Amino acid sequence: MKVRVGTTNPVKVRATERAFLRTFPDREITVEAVSVDPGVPPQPVGMEEVHQGAKNRAREAWNRGSYSVGLEAGLIRVGDVYVDLHVAVVRDPKGRETVGTSPGFQLPPDVTEEALSGEEVGEVFSELVGVREIGKRSGAIGVLSNGKVLREDLCELAILMALIGLETSR
C-alpha cells in the first residue's frame, strides 16, 4: 500500500507510517514524503486555517490509486486560551477525504503571544529551550510533558482518527 504524505518533516512521515501500520497490520506500507505548499500561513490560527492547510497538503500529495495524508498544526481558541493541536486529512485511493484531530494542549502564555503575532510555535520554542528544529524532534509537547507525549504521538493520533472516518464511510 502506497501512502504519500504532504511534508518532508520526519516526525510527520514516521507518524504516518505508524498509523497506517496499526490500521493495516497485514499490509506492506510504503510512505513517500512529498514537499507541498500548504497554502496557509506558517503558523495557522483557528480551526478553519489549520484544516485548510491539512486538506491542501493531502490533495497536493495525492495520486489516484494511493492514499495521501495532510497534517497541519495550529492554534485553536478554546474559551479564553489557545491550544495547539494537529489536524489530519486522509484521502483514500478513490479521492474520499476524512478528518481527524489530535489532543490539544495549552502553551505557555508568552509562546502563545508570539505565535499569535506570526511567529511559528516551533521556532519560538526552539529559541526558548535551545533545541534546533524542535518541530522535527519531540516538539513543544515533548518539552512541556517531559517526554511523556511527543509530537509524533500527536500526529499519529490525528491520522488514526481520520482513518476511523474512512472505515465508517464504507
Swiss-Prot record:
Pfam families xref list: NTPase_I-T
Entry binding sites for substrate: 7-12
Enzyme Commission number(s) from the entry: 3.6.1.73
EC class name: hydrolase
Keyword Disulfide bond on entry: no
One GO term (biological process): nucleotide metabolic process
Cofactor binding note of this UniProt entry: Binds 1 divalent metal cation per subunit; can use either Mg(2+) or Mn(2+).
Family that this chain belongs to: Belongs to the YjjX NTPase family.
Stated role: Phosphatase that hydrolyzes non-canonical purine nucleotides such as XTP and ITP to their respective diphosphate derivatives. Probably excludes non-canonical purines from DNA/RNA precursor pool, thus preventing their incorporation into DNA/RNA and avoiding chromosomal lesions.
Protein name: Probable inosine/xanthosine triphosphatase
